[in-house]
Design a protein with these regions (language model features):
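Glycine-rich phosphate-binding loop signature in dinucleotide/nucleotide-binding domains
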Residues: 4-6, 124-128, 181-187
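A short, Lys/Arg-enriched amphipathic alpha-helix followed by its capping loop at the start of a domain
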Residues: 33, 117-128
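Short glycine/serine/threonine/alanine-rich loop segments
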Residues: 39, 126-128, 208
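Substrate-recognition "cap/lid" segment bordering the active-site pocket of phosphatases
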Residues: 109, 131, 136-190, 197-201, ...
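Structural recognition of alpha->loop->beta junctions
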Residues: 149-160, 222-244
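Acidic, Mg2+-coordinating phosphoryl-transfer loop and its flanking beta/alpha structural elements
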Residues: 190-224
Length: 247
């Protein structure tokens, strides 16, 4: 198994599902966007439907007429009005979501072990950059990281911009993540995500070394950290996996 060692030149993290859980907020944004548009999908759109959009770019999602019909631009505008309010735990929208779905909405949750893992990577090699590479609007992503209390661990936060071809899941997003870091060997860049298919294919598309990290594995890390003794390699690397991706 490949390991994250002190020789790794840069570590890049996925956000949603890897370090935090905010899929409920994303799902609620879909539901409330449909509701605002008078679309009956507000009552039928499932969490599985939301999950199926994971890994897609903003441009891809909001050009999909099978989801939004012909009002894709309106949907995008409403969605990005709703999501920031949910980020701020807007009680009116939380209640509206509960009225529509019958479910109580959970706010952003930082996974157990996430902060400890980031802290360890930081002290293992203080000058090695740690980057967050997400698929959200960059301003929203930065706000979320700040609210989660994790912003101090990242040298750079990369989210979606208006340039669709440079956004995740395009491999060009990696170029934005490592710009000016003088990376000569792409395999020395570690990309850590939660999706064995999409995240690992994303890493492979650029040449980074991909690792899978789940909430369960983070909990293992949190339990192990008090026993760590070595800074040469991450002793809890066995909690991570590097699945083979068929090209």
């Amino acid at each position: 198994m490949q390991k994250i060692t002190k020789d790794s030149k840069c570590i890049i993290f996925d956000w949603d599902g890897t370090l935090v859980s905010c899929e409920q907020l994303v799902h609620a944004s879909y539901v409330l966007t449909f509701l605002k548009m008078g679309n009956d999908k507000a009552f039928t759109w499932s969490e599985a439907d939301t999950h199926a959009q994971n890994g897609k770019s903003r441009q891809t999602i909001f050009s999909d007429t099978t989801i939004w019909g012909t009002n894709t631009k309106e949907a995008e505008e409403i969605f990005y009005q709703v999501y920031p309010r949910l980020q701020q735990n807007d009680s009116v929208l939380f209640q509206l979501y509960q009225d529509v779905t019958g479910k109580q909405l959970q706010p952003l949750m930082v996974y157990e072990g996430a902060k400890e893992f980031l802290h360890y990577l930081k002290i293992q090699k203080p000058n090695r950059p740690i980057v967050l590479l997400g698929a959200k609007n960059e301003e929203l992503l930065r706000k979320e990281v700040f609210e989660a209390g994790l912003i101090q661990y990242f040298n750079r936060i990369i989210g979606n911009t208006v340039h669709a071809d440079a956004n995740k899941p395009s491999p060009k997003a990696f170029d934005r993540a490592v710009v000016n870091y003088h990376i000569s060997d792409k395999s020395s860049v570690c990309y850590i995500g939660d999706n064995p298919q999409k995240d690992m294919a994303f890493a492979q598309s650029w040449g980074a070394t991909g690792f899978i990290l789940t909430p369960e594995k983070l909990r293992e890390i949190a339990q192990f950290l008090p026993q760590q003794v070595s800074h040469k390699t991450i002793p809890f690397v066995a909690c991570l996996s590097t699945p083979h991706i068929n090209g």
